[in-house]
Every structure is written in structure tokens, then in C-alpha cells.
Amino acid sequence: MVFDPKLFKYAWAKRVIPICVILGLGYIDFACFYALGYREIYKFHSHGVAISLWVILAWCEVCVIAYWVLLVVTGPGKAPRVKPFNLYSSEDTSDLTPVPDYFFCDESGYPFWCSQCQSIKLPRTLHSKDRNYCILKFDHYCVWVGTVIGQRNYKYFLNFLIWFLMFFIVTLIYLSRYTKSNYDRGTKDIDHNYIVLYILSGYWILILSSLLAAHLWYVVHNMTTIDDMNIKKVKRYSRWTSNNDKTKRKDVRKIPGEETGIRYINIRYNDTRVIVQYTLNDFPFSFGFKRNWQNLWLNNNRTNGDFTQHESSYSRKRLAISFLLFLVPYVDLVYPSRERINVSDVEKSTLDSLYSHRLIEYEQYNDRLNDKFLDYINSKIKNNEFHMPRYLSPLAEDQQSSSEGSRPDNI
């Protein structure tokens, strides 16, 4: 559902495939409800068992369709347009945003920029050609449901996976129970619809269970599919480069995309800025299973906002509630919205300066960093393992020499 063939890159395929899925569900309904449920179980075994099959499968399918609709209607989450940072301390701030305490950048210290949206890119934001805007916490485009999965609809995607998986598990259980009796009843053959059901159920149980397990792993580490793909690219590229060492046999396979896993963060340090290097395996956005899980279900899949400012937000009671939202369908639709909406900063309504207002808006969407990562960055600064941004290059030499022995500010 994530790693799509090249065919899925075409716009027409993205429209046709969800329709094919719906038509496929229609056939599966015929095979389950009529061929298995009525012609076999209801007529030759038990009316009650047949009714239980119909009720359970109908409930699962209603959940699948409901969460599919929620996926599409809710959308992945649109990133706000952030004007360029005031890196050069310009007096004309009409089209600029104050520089935040930290932002992710390239090796030279410049923030990432989306040329299509004409905006600073927030962490883990990616521009979607299908939506024509940048997606918050972009995960992937799912061709099977026909929409982008991002920050806002990610939890509905997990619910969709659960109930789609349950649908096929229930189908396979009933099917395996009554296949032999269908075969033994005189014809020594089975209904050909059963063969199709076995193939489809086996295939989708394998795909959906693997995908659900992978995404639960992502939630535990507050990762995205893009993060995981980049980490795997690092391993492939490292393996390829080691195989192509001059002392070894050449690797004749296709050269993988270069990915070292090295990233950079631009941080306010004393009266200047510094660039610190880290790697993808440092997981700057992971706050541990308990917080990551509750941030997904109780804080709209965000690591910022008022919810994260209070330790009481991460109580055992709320952890239990978050599991309830995960396992019980539709509870999240009626759960009190005070923990689900984006909470605005109180100062936002009292600030007269549009310039300062832009920074507050940016901070509302900027991902927080975990303490372990901040300690790691601060330790690197203490050890002078940093360099100056290129836009401050005339001052770089003086700042580097004056920073020796000084204590870095905490972020």
C-alpha cells in the first residue's frame, strides 16, 4: 500500500485503482454473503452462524468505508505558508519571519524552501503534486484509497488498516471452517468463489498485517514512511560503497541514490547562530512510546501545543483512553475536542506586531525536539563540533574563536 509500482505514478491510475478496490469489495461481498453465508452455511448448517457472519462482516465493512471517507474528507493537513526568515537582520520586515531558536537546514545553514508554495518548509513537510500544497508530516500517497496520508488523517489510516484486516481474518476463519463440508457434499469439488476468497484473503492479510505492524513501529518512534525509506537508503548506499571499495570486487548492480543520513540543524547560540550535524538515527522527534502514542491519538499527531506542556497530559488514564480510541471504532469522533484541536497561544491575540505574530504561528507548527536530542546537540556545541552559517561567513572566524570555553545556551 506504500511501495507502489511505476504504473501507480500516472494520474489516471490513481483515480482508477480506488474504483477497482470498491468493485473488488463488491465481488467479495457476493462471495462471502451469498456463496459462503447463504448457499453453504444458512442452507446446510446453521441460520445463526450465517447471520453472525453477515453481521460481523457488515460491521467490519461499514468501519472500512467510514474510515476511508474520513481519510479523504479530513485530508492530510495543509502546512501554513511561512515567509522567509530574517537571516540578515533586515529592518524591512514586511515580508519576513523572525528567526526561530532552531530550524532544520542544509549544510550552509539555509532553511529548506518550497518553490511551489513559496514558503519555508516545516520539519517533515513535503510538497504534494496531487494536492498542490505542502503536507504536514507527509507519510505517503496511498493509491489504494486515493489520497495522501499525513498528520491529520494518519490515525484514521491506522483504523482503516485494522478493520480491513479484521474483515479478511473473519472471512478466512469462516471459509476454512466450511470448505470441507462444501467439498464432501457429493460433488467432490468446492465452489470456485472459495478459491478466489482464499487467494484474496491470504494476500490482503499478509499485506495489511505487515503494513499495520510497520506503521505501529513508526508510531512508537514517531517516524514516517519517508523517514524509514531514507534510513534504508543509507544502508543500501553504505552497502554499495563498501562493495565498490578498490580492494574488493566491483558491484555491478545499479547505483543507488546517494544518502548518507547526515542532517543539519541551525541553532541560536549566544548572540549568533551555529550549524550542528546529526544523523537520521538520532530520532529528534521521538519522545518515547507513551508520549508518541498519546500525541497521535490525543494531540492530533503533533509534538507541540498546550497538550505537550503539562506532564498530566501523559497520565495512565489518558494512555488507556488513547488505546480505546485506537481499538474501538468511532469513539474518536465523539471524544471531547478540547484535546483534539490546535490550541492557539494566548499571546497570539494580544500581539500587535504582525512580524512577531508570524513567529508564533510558525512555532505552533514546528515540531518540538526531545530532551535526549537537545542534550546531544548541546554536547556537540560544547565540544566545538559545529560550524557557522554561510550567510554569517564574514563573522565566522571571529565567532568560532570567541566561542571556545563558553557555555552553550539550552534550546
From Swiss-Prot:
One cellular component term from this protein's GO annotations in UniProt: Golgi apparatus
Catalytic residues identified in the record: C142 (s-palmitoyl cysteine intermediate)
Entry GO MF terms: protein-cysteine S-palmitoyltransferase activity
Keywords: Acyltransferase, Lipoprotein, Membrane, Palmitate, Transferase, Transmembrane, Transmembrane helix
Pfam families, sorted: DHHC
EC number: 2.3.1.225
Gene Ontology BP term (one): protein targeting to membrane
Family: Belongs to the DHHC palmitoyltransferase family. PFA5 subfamily.
Domain notes: The DHHC domain is required for palmitoyltransferase activity.
Name of the featured protein: Palmitoyltransferase PFA5
Lineage: Eukaryota, Fungi, Dikarya, Ascomycota, Saccharomycotina
